[in-house]
């Protein structure tokens, strides 16, 4: 069938951004399936969680829509927000129109006003922008920290960048002892891995999302050999 969604890849140091086709199968059997697995893993690690007694604050990118071709292109996060099942809207802040806005300053203000009076139990988004949003919410609400504003907040799901440079600031903004952090590796090309055990920082490679993996033996690669290894022949604990 015809592809109607294209996620803008961040590219690499040596290449420009690419537009990755997102099929219906990719949405359902990779990204959405991964989201369900991620939450299931969290609940397994924290069985006393009250995550679903509140709402999730989701911060994503923007989306361009072509009325003629009915195509969508933009950040993967925006495509996912736009394609979530209808029932997700009952548990999500902000509303979809605000979530997909392009003008970031106005977008952050609107999200802040919508979120500060809600019972927020989880956060999702890139750390750099999430920090800006949380600080803006504190400025508007007058609360001394995020835990005072949202006492039931317990989870931040993050990915896309190294979290270590941001961790101290998050702990200062959210001093709650029950706060948990869950890392994932979700790329435009597919959902790769998720932090499956706490407090371990390692991420579990997800193998049943329709992604074909190839690997390199680093010792041989350093010698100029570039033969790939398929998943079946991977040796554990070997670089």
Positions of predicted regions on the chain:
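Conserved AMP-binding loop of ANL adenylate-forming enzymes
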Residues: 40-86
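Short secondary-structure capping/junction motifs at helix and strand boundaries
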Residues: 17-20, 40-54, 121, 178-182
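Short, solvent-exposed loop/turn and secondary-structure capping segments
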Residues: 20-21, 69, 135
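Conserved adenylation A10 loop of the ANL superfamily
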Residues: 6-20
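Conserved structural elements of the adenylate-forming
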Residues: 22-45
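General structural concept
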Residues: 1-9, 25, 30
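Active-site glycine/GP-rich loop and adjacent strand/helix microenvironment
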Residues: 1, 79-239
